[in-house]
Amino acid sequence: MSEAKIGLIDIETSPLRAHTWGLFDQNVGLNQIDREWTILSFCFKPLGASKKLTEYMDTAGDPLNDKAIVQRLWEIMHDYDFLIAQNGKRFDMRKMRARMILHDLPPPSPVRVIDTMLMARQVAAFTSNKLEWLSTYLSKIQKSKHKAFPGFELWSECLNDNPKAWAAMKKYNIPDVLSMEQVYLKLRPWVTGHPN
């Protein structure tokens, strides 16, 4: 029996663009949306592999065209038995599947999701289960901050195809996966029934 293929993944998505009449408690109708969300970038790394094998891909040059990214994500999902992701069950996997369906791709081979946020919640009562907190205390690599493009500005400038914003996105996306790997390895022995 061959060893299970396990990888770590993190995606960054663009926001929907919609028209509203206010800032708080808005109900946005479907006819108010004028731009669908897409996947802007992803980072992937096989568990335990050298940092040199970390893969990063983005939509620089054509920010709203995620077809190539979605195809590559499909290949990764099809090829791996387990994918580790922070908030992966609620966000990353569902978003990736949505884009795969919209791009008319067939379902990839079944992949099991290991969600580091749910692992943290299951084994302990940390102050926060966000990657920013977990990586500060459980990893030598911290979740990156994008100071040159604070808050939403990073996503906005990537959508404007600003090369400096894309460079910042890469510096933001890759450490998420590297720190998540260390968080996962720290939590794994604490999860009952989880293979070590």
Where are these regions (language model features)?
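Conserved aromatic-histidine-acidic binding/catalytic patches
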Residues: 30, 34, 61, 84-88, ...
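Short, function-defining helix-loop hinge/capping sites that tune catalysis or transport
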Residues: 18-20, 95, 123, 184
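Conserved DEDDh/DEDDy metal-dependent 3′-5′ exonuclease domain
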Residues: 50-138
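Acidic, Mg2+-coordinating catalytic module of metal-dependent nucleases/exonucleases
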Residues: 84, 133-196
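Short, surface-exposed recognition loops or helix-turn segments adjacent to catalytic cores
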Residues: 28-30, 108-117, 145-155
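Conserved RNase H-like, two-metal-ion catalytic cores of nucleic-acid enzymes
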Residues: 1-78
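Hydrophobic alpha-helical membrane context
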Residues: 22, 99, 127, 187-188
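Acidic active-site catalytic centers that drive phospho-/nucleotidyl reactions
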Residues: 10-12, 92, 115, 176
